[in-house]
A protein has these predicted regions:
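Mid-length scaffold segments of soluble, non-membrane domains
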Residues: 112-185
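Sec-dependent N-terminal signal peptides
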Residues: 15-24
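Short, Lys/Arg-enriched N-terminal segments with co-localized hydrophobic residues
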Residues: 1-11
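Residue-level signature of catalytic and energy-coupling elements of molecular machines
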Residues: 77, 147, 242
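Sec/Tat signal peptide C-region and signal peptidase I cleavage site
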Residues: 26-30
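N-terminal Sec/ER secretory leader and immediately downstream segment
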Residues: 33-121
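A cross-kingdom marker for long, charged
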Residues: 34-47, 216, 223-256
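An amphipathic alpha-helical core segment
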Residues: 181-222
Length: 256
């Protein structure tokens, strides 16, 4: 047992040393490492001699490496959304005018209120950008609590297996955490004011019906949609290796 433990510790130290080196090098170049680069580093490690291919030692050490890779990937996703224009400047996740008031907004734009429409859209995205850092703790907790079976499922799953895992495990809790903070942020950045201004100017116009919208719910859900989309895009970087490499990694870990 002592020999096995020693070999496992040495293997873990090698993984951590590789990751530390990648992180230090990336810091020097002002860039975070990609998930792909970390997984390639782990892939190059020799198989554990303590239990052969697919041993518990292999699974634990490589599992730790996958967790670290996911930690880096989710951090990159959160950081990219947290900056100025993280949502607003990214067409894939930009929060657009809600469908329920889009007709009102279209009419408003055509009759001189484009400024109010633009302010409303911008303020929703600014609120999402301000709230995005909240997700970091939830990702960290989910990664920490991953079981070996969770890691196995992510390794053998589809292109967004980890993202699906996070969404299933976290979305409800994230919604609960995000909504009150976003409600506050929406008010701070003027989304509610812009919305009321936009709707208020047209609610008495004969050809426009008064519309209603749970703005906090809308912005919260759209913020989370954008968050998981971005994590999914980051995860796909893991899956871009040639099939042989992926198979080699799976053989190293699971003996397949």
């Amino acid at each position: 047992p002592g020999v096995v433990r020693g070999k496992e510790e040495n293997q873990m130290k090698r993984i951590l040393a590789i990751m530390f080196g990648v992180l230090i090098a990336s810091t020097a170049s002002a860039q975070m490492p990609s998930l792909d680069s970390i997984m390639k580093s782990i892939q190059d490690l020799p198989k554990s001699q303590s239990g052969g291919s697919g041993s518990v030692t292999d699974l634990k050490t490589t599992g730790a490496g996958i967790k670290e890779a996911l930690a880096v990937g989710t951090e990159r996703a959160v950081n990219s959304l947290s900056g100025v224009n993280g949502y607003f400047g990214n067409q894939a996740v930009k929060i657009l005018m809600p469908d329920s008031i889009k007709r009102v907004a279209d009419i408003a734009s055509k009759v001189g209120f484009q400024k109010q429409v633009d302010a409303f859209v911008l303020s929703m995205n600014r609120a999402a950008e301000a709230a995005a850092p909240l997700a970091a703790k939830y990702f960290a907790d989910a990664i920490r609590d991953m079981s070996l079976e969770d890691v196995r499922g992510i390794m053998t799953g589809g292109n967004t297996a980890a993202t699906d895992f996070f969404s299933n495990k976290m979305r409800g809790n994230l919604y609960t955490a995000f909504k009150p903070v976003l409600a506050k942020k929406v008010g701070e950045v003027g989304a509610t004011r812009a919305y009321k201004d936009l709707i208020g100017r047209y609610e008495n116009v004969p050809f426009v019906n008064k519309q209603s919208l749970d703005l906090d719910d809308y912005v919260t859900n759209k913020s989370l949609d954008g968050l998981f989309h971005t994590v999914g895009e980051e995860e796909k970087k893991i899956r871009t290796n040639p099939a042989a490499r992926t198979t080699e990694l799976l053989k190293t870990v699971f003996g397949k």
